[in-house]
Amino acid sequence: MFDSTLNPLWQRYILAVQEEVKPALGCTEPISLALAAAVAAAELEGPVERVEAWVSPNLMKNGLGVTVPGTGMVGLPIAAALGALGGNANAGLEVLKDATAQAIADAKALLAAGKVSVKIQEPCNEILFSRAKVWNGEKWACVTIVGGHTNIVHIETHNSVVFTQQACVAEGEQESPLTVLSRTTLAEILKFVNEVPFAAIRFILDSAKLNCALSQEGLSGKWGLHIGATLEKQCERGLLAKDLSSSIVIRTSAASDARMGGATLPAMSNSGSGNQGITATMSVVVVAEHFGADDERLARALMLSHLSAIYIHNQLPRLSALCAATTAAMGAAAGMAWLVDGRYETISMAISSMIGDVSGMICDGASNSCAMKVSTSASAAWKAVLMALDDTAVTGNEGIVAHDVEQSIANLCALASHSMQQTDRQIIEIMASKAR
């Protein structure tokens, strides 16, 4: 996987990135349910005739308004149906990559026949929870995912318990790669990025390959709110300058347009989110291209961006009322600042300004409008970098920003983890009332 002679801390960083930066086809909350349904279907004796599902309020929030790839339909029911009838149980976040036209037609027919139900799990203390139960006559199979989009904790059929995570705890005593992030700092991450052998991090270039393809697809103007394509048209009309700033916003938002609009191309995700992966990748790629960076320099900038985004998001709930495109863009700000300047002071100032700028943006569920939040976050990240290059930043005398960037991050994450939980409940209540 990588050179075993590396600094042990660096090995943990690389493992953390490999754990959190993965290809994902479709918005990851509906995909989590699709995966549960696909695994359940693989355990079922006979073809699926009916699907029942239960999800946490947060997963419901992020599944109500987003298009499931290849279907032209939004919502969790089609995700559950297609996962059960056409999903690849071994493909993780790419569970729907092999879904055929026939499987899509069958899933839609199952929906039309009223054979698919998705409800909120009550009570539910988990932020990320999905359970799918598939039926063939009186025979059934049920799969439960908790805590992570692909973290299967229980598989059961009508006649046996196939798997339960608790029974495997003794075998898995090795701590999570993410645990190291609670004991590290941005300064240590920067040292790693500057000194790690290129060969050990070359894999991160795959994020540029996948997300650039998604961005190019988004520029066709067929997906979502087509923000990227619209802004590109305004450049051609002379209403918007065609420069580095606009290119960052256009190419980043275009990838999100395609992602949320249901394009059948994978995104390279970050922290379980395609939009976070797009945000952490595309801005950095555009700046790297502008300065003619080679593959090694791009890889180091992308590693700084993705690892910083993971480091910040690791202090947050997996899903919350805080739009995590903002925290991914803080990683992007670090990556862009490194490309232009390379100094820790510039990077920390850029992140502090981001916290002083977009930290209040709410997550009101996954939808086409996520691309607007992605574009706003990307724009704010570049603005923060430009300010930092001029030795200007939001200071510790203002708002929740502290004099130390680590404390600023902790302050932001404390808000999202505690006070904003009531905001999250209110958002879910509003969205649920609209769906009635």
From Swiss-Prot:
InterPro entries, A to Z: Ser_deHydtase-like_asu (IPR005130), UPF0597 (IPR021144)
GO molecular function term, any single one: L-cysteine desulfhydrase activity
GO terms classed as biological process: L-cysteine catabolic process to pyruvate
Family recorded in the similarity comment: Belongs to the UPF0597 family.
PANTHER family the UniProt entry points to: UPF0597 PROTEIN YHAM
Protein name (record): UPF0597 protein YhaM
Taxonomic placement: Bacteria, Pseudomonadati, Pseudomonadota, Gammaproteobacteria, Enterobacterales
